[in-house]
A protein has these predicted regions:
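Enzyme catalytic cores with a strong preference for nitrogen-chemistry domains
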Residues: 1-171
Length: 171
């Protein structure tokens, strides 16, 4: 999906349509990119409390559509320390839990987001343990717990030849 910077309403509608489509095909989980709700690069918008609150409202709207399907939605999220890049894990019951990016590695992000979160979290869906990792935190993971069945990396990094191969090699 192609998300537009600052167009929370349109981005949310795209996400909801994709959730409805995945649900109609019997999917248990659907995942979206880092900053899917806000679009990226959002830079200066991430310093606006109103913008961050609108993103949180959008995640709540998306959660209402997640009855019977889980979703992982990339969004900025305002914490007590400041805005973070997060993945909103929305359960099949519509409950929201935010998983935040731990490291701010790109200079272009510095000053807009803080990196003080846990960085990754294991969730369980239909008996499968899935590790959800936000942003470039995947490049700092040394090893995975053997109980993890799959990794979902919510990342908005630009395409670069060989990047995926290097990431897999690190894991």
């Amino acid at each position: 999906l192609n998300f537009t910077v600052g167009d929370i309403k349109s981005n949310t509608e795209k996400i909801i349509r994709a959730i409805d489509n995945a649900k109609s095909q019997g999917a248990d989980l659907v995942a979206f990119a880092e900053f899917a709700v806000s679009g990226t690069p959002a830079y200066g918008l991430l310093t606006k409390t109103t913008f961050l609150e609108l993103c949180e409202d959008a995640v709540e709207r998306i959660a209402k559509k997640c009855r019977g399907i889980a979703a992982i939605v990339g969004t900025p999220y305002l914490t007590a320390e400041g805005p973070i890049s997060a993945a909103a894990y929305i359960s099949k019951r519509g409950e929201i839990e935010y998983i935040g990016k731990r490291y701010v590695t790109a200079r272009r992000e510095m000053g807009y987001i803080v990196g003080s979160s846990i960085g990754s979290q294991t969730i369980s869906i239909e008996g499968n343990n899935l590790k959800v990792v936000v942003g470039d935190d995947i490049s700092r993971m040394e090893e995975l717990d053997e109980s993890v069945d799959a990794v979902i990396s919510v990342n908005a990094r630009r395409y670069g030849k060989g990047i995926m191969t290097r990431r897999f090699d690190k894991m």
